[in-house]
Amino acid sequence: MGLKHLIEKLEPHFTHGGKLEKYYPLYEAAATIFYTPGQVTRGAAHVRDAIDLKRMMILVWFAVFPAMFWGMYNVGLQTIPALHKLYGAEQLQQAIANNWHYSVAQWLGVSFSADAGWLSMMTLGAVFFLPIYITVFIVGGFWEVLFAIVRKHEINEGFFVTSILFALIVPPTLPLWQAALGISFGVVIAKEIFGGTGRNFLNPALAGRAFLFFAYPAQISGDLVWTAADGFSGATPLSQWASGGGEALVNVATGVPVSWMDAFLGNIPGSIGEVSTLMIFIGGAIILFGRVASWRIVAGVMIGMIATATLFNVIGSDTNPMFAMPWYWHLVLGGFAFGMMFMATDPVSASFTDKGKWSYGVLIGVMCVLIRVVNPAYPEGMMLAILFANLFAPLFDYLVVQANIKRRKSRG
């Protein structure tokens, strides 16, 4: 019996009148993973295309894999030197025994020696990342299924993307219960309350992170959360620049200065998926060439960031080192690159019109640099910049449409 035949045989049990009718969203979600939906458009007008919502979301899901795998490797790369800086040999073994992440990693064969190989670093990073991702996926999926069953509609595949994006923009040390709480806020409050996928005006992953930032700032920001070594305090390069300028950039664990290439490749502490600009650009190219993301938004964000950073460079300041940060450093530090490629380009919460996309992107770039430079308490500005632009996206589209209407009336 083939898989397709099995799926077709089970379908009557889940359709109207079947014993499992109320669970049809679960059946439909599983069936359309393997095969395209059987329904076709019968009336005019419609578009024939090789991609549907599920496959579009899966493309984005795969596109973040380069940043995800590098992020896991980087967690180990930052953690092992930090552990050796904190502990001697005997103390390190005690620390491993007292931390379940380290214990699981050691059981999996991870070497905690100073010369540990890339596989040990990757495995250690996976031990921190995968529990966060699995927690977020299960909790987010639960809410998606619950709302689909109650509303009697198909399960929206957006949670595939929302879950992995959320897991990649948080620190590796985030408690699992906070990960569950954050994704619950993002899915329920920022998306499902407004009608689900396609109707939300805020990016759910960013909304969930913003909730954690304001509700539990100690676990989502500061100097203690970016390196997964118990008791280790190390600021991100963005925070270091904010306090001491470019000369202050140094890897706290190794004592080695941080170069621009280190930041571009991702050899710095930070949120799991935001550290490597190179890997983010590789994934971003996939969704840009796949036409899932809009190049106009990406270009607008870059233009807004470069113009605003250059303006602050020209103005200068004797008391605020952030005024002197060049645009190419803004690009590789913090969550700018990840936000530009995967958050700002969210087709639901971004502007729809071409001109609106330019305005939307420029606003994000301007606001990100403005928050980073002018706000001394919050050196990272990409999250708030995108959420702020989400609120203005409908206005940009409205103004573009009204301008088109006026132009057509003037012709006639």
Curated annotation (Swiss-Prot):
<keyword id="KW-0472">Membrane</keyword>
<keyword id="KW-1003">Cell membrane</keyword>
<feature type="transmembrane region" description="Helical">
    <location>
        <begin position="127"/>
        <end position="147"/>
    </location>
</feature>
<dbReference type="GO" id="GO:0005886">
    <property type="term" value="C:plasma membrane"/>
</dbReference>
<comment type="similarity">
    <text>Belongs to the NqrB/RnfD family.</text>
</comment>
<dbReference type="GO" id="GO:0006814">
    <property type="term" value="P:sodium ion transport"/>
</dbReference>
<keyword id="KW-0997">Cell inner membrane</keyword>
<keyword id="KW-0812">Transmembrane</keyword>
<dbReference type="GO" id="GO:0010181">
    <property type="term" value="F:FMN binding"/>
</dbReference>
<feature type="transmembrane region" description="Helical">
    <location>
        <begin position="322"/>
        <end position="342"/>
    </location>
</feature>
<feature type="transmembrane region" description="Helical">
    <location>
        <begin position="270"/>
        <end position="290"/>
    </location>
</feature>
<keyword id="KW-0597">Phosphoprotein</keyword>
<feature type="transmembrane region" description="Helical">
    <location>
        <begin position="381"/>
        <end position="401"/>
    </location>
</feature>
<feature type="transmembrane region" description="Helical">
    <location>
        <begin position="297"/>
        <end position="317"/>
    </location>
</feature>
<dbReference type="GO" id="GO:0022904">
    <property type="term" value="P:respiratory electron transport chain"/>
</dbReference>
<comment type="function">
    <text>NQR complex catalyzes the reduction of ubiquinone-1 to ubiquinol by two successive reactions, coupled with the transport of Na(+) ions from the cytoplasm to the periplasm. NqrA to NqrE are probably involved in the second step, the conversion of ubisemiquinone to ubiquinol.</text>
</comment>
<dbReference type="InterPro" id="IPR010966">
    <property type="entry name" value="NqrB"/>
</dbReference>
<keyword id="KW-0915">Sodium</keyword>
<keyword id="KW-0830">Ubiquinone</keyword>
<keyword id="KW-0406">Ion transport</keyword>
<feature type="modified residue" description="FMN phosphoryl threonine">
    <location>
        <position position="236"/>
    </location>
</feature>
<dbReference type="GO" id="GO:0055085">
    <property type="term" value="P:transmembrane transport"/>
</dbReference>
<comment type="subunit">
    <text>Composed of six subunits; NqrA, NqrB, NqrC, NqrD, NqrE and NqrF.</text>
</comment>
<dbReference type="InterPro" id="IPR004338">
    <property type="entry name" value="NqrB/RnfD"/>
</dbReference>
<keyword id="KW-1278">Translocase</keyword>
<keyword id="KW-0285">Flavoprotein</keyword>
<keyword id="KW-1133">Transmembrane helix</keyword>
<feature type="transmembrane region" description="Helical">
    <location>
        <begin position="163"/>
        <end position="183"/>
    </location>
</feature>
<keyword id="KW-0813">Transport</keyword>
<dbReference type="GO" id="GO:0016655">
    <property type="term" value="F:oxidoreductase activity, acting on NAD(P)H, quinone or similar compound as acceptor"/>
</dbReference>
<keyword id="KW-0739">Sodium transport</keyword>
<keyword id="KW-0288">FMN</keyword>
<protein>
    <recommendedName>
        <fullName>Na(+)-translocating NADH-quinone reductase subunit B</fullName>
        <ecNumber>7.2.1.1</ecNumber>
    </recommendedName>
</protein>
<feature type="transmembrane region" description="Helical">
    <location>
        <begin position="57"/>
        <end position="77"/>
    </location>
</feature>
<feature type="transmembrane region" description="Helical">
    <location>
        <begin position="358"/>
        <end position="378"/>
    </location>
</feature>
<dbReference type="Pfam" id="PF03116">
    <property type="entry name" value="NQR2_RnfD_RnfE"/>
</dbReference>
<keyword id="KW-0520">NAD</keyword>
